[in-house]
C-alpha cells in the first residue's frame, strides 16, 4: 500500500495490515520523540485544520502532532471565523484551502462531508469526525491504547457503554475490532442501541456480540470498558435526550465487581458518566489515551505526506 497522498476518511477503508502499519509507525515515532524531543520529518510542510464543529483533543493533538514532526499549522477552530459564514460552499472552501497547505484535517457536522472534501482536494484529507458517522483517527488511537496496555488486542473482552446510536467513536471502533479475535459487549439504553446494520455486520464477520442494558451484569467479564457520553447535540428532540440522560455512571461502587485488570477508556469530553473518584484508580487510562492521540496522528500525517 502506497500511503503518500492517501485520504483517511473511514475505518472501512482500512485493512488489518493498514491498521498495524499505523500502530507500528506510531510506536516508532513515540520512541523517537522521547529520545529527541523534536522531529523534522515534516519540515517545510503545512497542515490546515478545518473545524466546523467544536473540538479540544482532536484539533490540539493534530496541531501538536504536526509541530512535533517539524511542520506548521494553519486553519480555523469554528466555521464562524471563515467565509462559510458568508455562504461559501464546502467545495469552494476546500479548493481554496488546499492552495495553502500539504494536508487537510476536517471535522464537520454533516455525514459524508469528509468524503466530499477528499473528492474535491488534490492534497490528502483526514477525517476528524463527520456527524455521527465516522471518527477513524480516534479509533486508531483507541487500538493503539489497548495494544500498549495489554500488549495485544486478540483475546480481550471489550465493552462499549453509553450512546451507541449517535456515537461515531464507537461505530468506528466496533468496525475496526472485527479484524481481531475479541468479544464485544454493547451496553446502552434501548433508545441508544448500536444501529442494527452495524450489529448485523459484526456478527456476519464472526464476532461474538452481546447486547444488554445493564452494566452490572457484564462488568465482571470485561478487560476494557469504553465509556461514551450521551450526546445531547445529536438528538433531534430534547425530550428523547431527557429520557436517557444520566443512564449510567461508572463509580467506585460499580467497580467493586470489576476485574483488577479492567481498563476504562473514554474518548472525552465526559459529562457525568465517569465519576471523578475513578480518575486515580488503576482502572482509569483515559488521560493516557489522550496522550496517545499525538503519536498516532503523527504517524498518519507522516504516512500520508510520504515523509516516513
UniProtKB/Swiss-Prot annotation:
Highest taxon in the source lineage: Archaea
Positions that bind L-aspartate: 86, 168, 229
Pathway in which the depicted protein is active: Pyrimidine metabolism; UMP biosynthesis via de novo pathway; (S)-dihydroorotate from bicarbonate: step 2/3
Molecular function GO labels: amino acid binding; aspartate carbamoyltransferase activity
GO biological process, one term: 'de novo' pyrimidine nucleobase biosynthetic process
A Pfam family this chain is assigned to: OTCace_N
Catalytic activity: carbamoyl phosphate + L-aspartate = N-carbamoyl-L-aspartate + phosphate + H(+)
E.C. number(s) listed in UniProt: 2.1.3.2
Keywords: Pyrimidine biosynthesis, Transferase
InterPro entries (alphabetical): Asp/Orn_carbamoyltranf_P-bd (IPR006132), Asp/Orn_carbamoylTrfase (IPR006130), Asp/Orn_carbamoylTrfase_sf (IPR036901), Asp_carbamoyltransf (IPR002082), Asp_carbamoyltransf_Asp/Orn-bd (IPR006131)
Binding site for carbamoyl phosphate: 57-58, 107, 135, 138, 268-269
Family statement: Belongs to the aspartate/ornithine carbamoyltransferase superfamily. ATCase family.
Subunit structure: Heterooligomer of catalytic and regulatory chains.
Function as written in the Swiss-Prot or TrEMBL entry: Catalyzes the condensation of carbamoyl phosphate and aspartate to form carbamoyl aspartate and inorganic phosphate, the committed step in the de novo pyrimidine nucleotide biosynthesis pathway.
Name under which the protein is recorded: Aspartate carbamoyltransferase catalytic subunit
Organism (species): Pyrococcus abyssi (strain GE5 / Orsay)
Gene symbol of the encoding locus: pyrB
Amino acid at each position: 500500500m502506497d500511503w503518500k497522498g492517501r485520504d483517511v476518511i473511514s475505518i472501512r477503508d482500512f485493512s488489518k495490515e493498514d491498521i498495524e502499519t499505523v500502530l507500528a509507525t506510531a510506536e516508532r515515532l513515540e520512541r523517537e520523540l522521547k529520545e529527541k524531543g523534536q522531529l523534522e520529518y515534516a519540515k517545510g510542510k503545512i497542515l490546515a485544520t478545518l473545524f466546523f464543529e467544536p473540538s479540544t483533543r482532536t484539533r490540539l493533538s493534530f496541531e501538536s502532532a504536526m509541530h512535533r514532526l517539524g511542520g506548521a499549522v494553519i486553519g480555523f477552530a469554528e466555521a464562524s471565523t471563515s467565509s462559510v459564514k458568508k455562504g461559501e460552499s464546502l467545495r469552494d472552501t476546500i479548493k481554496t484551502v488546499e492552495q495553502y497547505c500539504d494536508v487537510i484535517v476536517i471535522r464537520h457536522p454533516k455525514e459524508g462531508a469528509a468524503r466530499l472534501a477528499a473528492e474535491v482536494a488534490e492534497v490528502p484529507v483526514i477525517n476528524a469526525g463527520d456527524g455521527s458517522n465516522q471518527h477513524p483517527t480516534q479509533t486508531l488511537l483507541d487500538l493503539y491504547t489497548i495494544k500498549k496496555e495489554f500488549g495485544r488486542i486478540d483475546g480481550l473482552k471489550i465493552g462499549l457503554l453509553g450512546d451507541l446510536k449517535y456515537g461515531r467513536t464507537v461505530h468506528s471502533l466496533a468496525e475496526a475490532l472485527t479484524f481481531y479475535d475479541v468479544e464485544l459487549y454493547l451496553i446502552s439504553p434501548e433508545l441508544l442501541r448500536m444501529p442494527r446494520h452495524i450489529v448485523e455486520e459484526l456478527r456476519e464477520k464472526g464476532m461474538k456480540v452481546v447486547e444488554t442494558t445493564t452494566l452490572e451484569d457484564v462488568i465482571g467479564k470485561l478487560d476494557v470498558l469504553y465509556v461514551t457520553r450521551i450526546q445531547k447535540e445529536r438528538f433531534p428532540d430534547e425530550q428523547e435526550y431527557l429520557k436517557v440522560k444520566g443512564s449510567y455512571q461508572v463509580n467506585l461502587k460499580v467497580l467493586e465487581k470489576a476485574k483488577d485488570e479492567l481498563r476504562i477508556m473514554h474518548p472525552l469530553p465526559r459529562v457525568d458518566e465517569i465519576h471523578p473518584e475513578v480518575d486515580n484508580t488503576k482502572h482509569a487510562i483515559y488521560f493516557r489515551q489522550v496522550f496517545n492521540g499525538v503519536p498516532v496522528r503523527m504517524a498518519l500525517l507522516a504516512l500520508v505526506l510520504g515523509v516516513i
